[in-house]
Structure formats: structure tokens, C-alpha cells
Amino acid sequence: MKTVLVTGGTRGIGLSTAQKFIDQGWNVYITSRKEENLAAVLSDNSQLKGFVARADDLVAATETCKKIVDETGSLDVLINNAGTNPSGGSLLDVDLSAVQKTWDVNLMGPLMWTREAVKAGLKESVLNVCSVGGIRPSQYMGAYNISKAGLIYMTKQLAMELAPDVRVNGIAPAIVKTKLSEMLWISDEKGSADLHALKKLGEPEDVASLIYFLSSDDASWITGEVVTIDGGFLL
């Protein structure tokens, strides 16, 4: 049985991705920065296992990857899903500590977890959850979008460095109905949906299906790609 680790796996895209892998018969581990959130999710699903670990904590990344390999004998796939956005506003005005936090979690975090997973013996693939914000700039989300643009480039760089042994791909969603993106749609869901050619927001399950495909053997000849899943947002 193969093993996957999903960072930030207690809600939204992360939780839906974890469930998708469970449905396909994988060993599934998740991380959460909050112990109470992790405990609540694990109590609802006996097939899930998890660790309390912040996305920007190198020691936690090292220990988590090692424990998973010790418990299961392998770590096959890493999903770098954990992200944050405490830094809304103009780059000229936004608090610099919030910008640093955004970049630490969204950019340094995936690098840390990928490095530690590889050191622990990662076998097959890495999947980075990027964003269309890393492709097209938008008002008031500069720090977040810069972090995702960096993650898109990092995906390609790591794909080159880790080939031929480990594949590295990414996905770039538009507005998905999650807690993290709530500020983008909660006050006017129809208006937000209308920004997409398909006139609807994404669901976490939509994204999870693409993540699973890119992580699976069905995508064994795909690496270095960042696939948009945006309902036509970029058209």
C-alpha cells in the first residue's frame, strides 16, 4: 500500500485530497498547525493519521517525514497544500511581518517539506498547490500572489533537480469554496462565480481529483507542469 502526506489536511482542498487518496486505498497522513483541528478530523475518520506540524517548521518537517517512513516503510507522495494569506493589501502598505509570514508558509514551507521528504526516501512525486494568482496579478493580494508565483517556478526547478526519480507538478486553482479563500466570495458568491467562464466556483473535490491524477501512476510521464484548474478564470 502506498503512502501520501498532505500538509494542511484538516479542511478544504487538503481534507478533500486526503479523502480522495483514502478512497483509492492509500495510507494517508495529514498535518495541521492546530492540535484541536487535527483531533477533530481524526476522530471523524479512523483511516486518517496525522501530526501537529506547522508548514514553516523545519524540525517538524524532518520528524514527520521520518516517523511516516518508520511506521509504513515508505513515503511515496507529498502534497504541499498548507498555505496562508494574512497579508492582504497594497505591497506599499501591508505589514512586512505579515508578508514574511506569507512567504515563509507558502514558499519556504514547500521547499522545506520537499527537502525533508526526499531525505526520508520519497519515492514517486511531489504536488504543489499553487494559484492562478501566481500567473495573473490582482489588487490587494500582492504578497500572496508573489509567493505562489515563486512556488510555480520552484515546481519547475525541483522537477528538473529531482528527475528522473521523483516527479514534481503543481496545480493552480482559481476561486475555490474554502475557508482560506472565503474573503473572495462570501459576500457575493454569484459575483465571484461570474468571474469564471463556467459561472461557478470551484469545489475542493474538483481540485482533489486533479491532485490525485497528477500524483498517480496515470501521470507517470508528466513532470514540471503546473495545471490550471480555474473554471475559465484566465480566459
PLM ranges: what are they?
Residues 10-11:
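Conserved glycine-rich cofactor-binding loop
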Residues 92-111, 127, 144, 151:
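Catalytic Tyr-X3-Lys loop
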